[in-house]
Amino acid sequence: CAEAATGSVCQIANDNGGGQLVISGSKPAVEHAARLCTEKGAKRALMLQVSAPFHSALMQPTADAMREALANVTVNAPIVPVVANVVVAPVSDPQEIAARLVEQVTGRVRWRETVEWFAANGVTTLYEVGSGKVLSGLARRIDRNVATANIGAAADIDVALAALN
């Protein structure tokens, strides 16, 4: 990324594990980085169709807006531990939770490290909330012992809660 940036922004946005990294930044710098990756032997380098340079310094105005918005929101302490992906550590203080959410807008998604943290701390099942199953697949590639379940509809919430009890 440093070689491709040449005065603009190019940085690792996601460490998805299994050698899969996502980079973000200015389009010319990311395109240059993709070419460099291929030239240096990367298995492949794909340009993702995204609407913004997520998880990069170019998102700072959005992070600032999020900080302002969260200043008007009451964040409560969680009932269960919440692992902040941007620091790969549990957070429970409401002010720290808000700060980490803001930090994540420009910060790297550390999915590989997060799944490794879960495994090291006795987490055996991961629930992916939303219509996709991408994170579940990535998690199983990182740790074959982890079980995953998807919550894609309201009815799935009841099934997941029953499994937890």
Regions found by a protein language model. Name each.
Residues 1-149, 155-158, 164-165:
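Acyltransferase
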